[in-house]
């Protein structure tokens, strides 16, 4: 079985082809870790993610990678949960507007659906019906599955906030231009610096928990 653990310099495979996730993880994990992509060890096919929950998807991806290479590895699955949409996109976050994972279209769909809910509420009020304003409250959740020395460990992180009314900012990736974190009122994740985002992000919290565990148990 090939493994990548080397004393104080830990090489570990991150089951992602997403350059944004890889950059974020590399910046959050300190110099004691070196991330390796599946492509770098010859795994170029799409890693399956057919689970019905974030945990299931994260576990499925990590197990697939471990079975293919037998290496220390980890995978994450992240979902955006919007209260007014009943928790959607949730596990469908990356493919909310289609299988092509087009995040501009994903964001457009979210903004449209929330605007429709708000319009419906206003119309109902005009007819004297009692309604509550559509909530824009939302949260990101990340679940990381680490397979280390053949054993499986889970780490989670959550970021609370709300959905903006329009895209804003040029930074980040994914849904960042429409997510306003509670820590930065009036600013989306794409408006703040990468350093500021990494300090509060859902994935950052899960990654730091994983890094702490590895340093204590490697």
Residue ranges and their predicted role:
Residues 7-13, 20-218:
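Anionic-ligand binding patches
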